[in-house]
From Swiss-Prot:
SMART domains attached to this UniProt entry: RL11
Name of encoding gene: rpl11
HAMAP family per record: Ribosomal_uL11
Quaternary assembly: Part of the ribosomal stalk of the 50S ribosomal subunit. Interacts with L10 and the large rRNA to form the base of the stalk. L10 forms an elongated spine to which L12 dimers bind in a sequential fashion forming a multimeric L10(L12)X complex.
Similarity comment text for this entry: Belongs to the universal ribosomal protein uL11 family.
Naturally occurring in which organism (per UniProt): Methanospirillum hungatei JF-1 (strain ATCC 27890 / DSM 864 / NBRC 100397 / JF-1)
Protein name as catalogued: Large ribosomal subunit protein uL11
Example of a GO cellular component annotation carried by this entry: large ribosomal subunit
Keyword RNA-binding: yes
Amino acid sequence: MAEVVEVLVPGGKATAGPPLGPALGPLGINVKAVVDEINKKTASFNGMQVPVRVEVDEKKNFTISVGIPPTTALIMKEAGVEKGSGEPNTKIVGDVPLEAAVTIAKMKLDDMLSYDLKNAVKEVVGTCVSLGITVSGKKPKDMLKEIDSGAHDAVLVG
């Protein structure tokens, strides 16, 4: 029976320390080899937390699958901010263009509850509310109203 370890690691910067080392050590595999491969596979997500799944079979062979970072991490990277606002209703920390929200929605579509791109984009824009990030210079709630009215349907065709 294969053992499975699921962790969030910093993209391209995983180490043999927690959370990976303690989880992989008891399985008797080369932790450094696993860490090196994870860092190769997650290098493009530098600076973001990335979900990683390591499967180890009975013969100590391992396979690594890398997920897509959380929506908040993708939005913050696009906005160029380190963390969201502590007061999202009053303090704005960044802005993302609607096109970036569409791109993020396309990346995350399989993991979302939405059935179509328009609603997935609304989920991403809704996440911007709690981060204190505007969308194309507008408050996220105003952008949601515009999306509902069909004002951006040309961008949302996917």
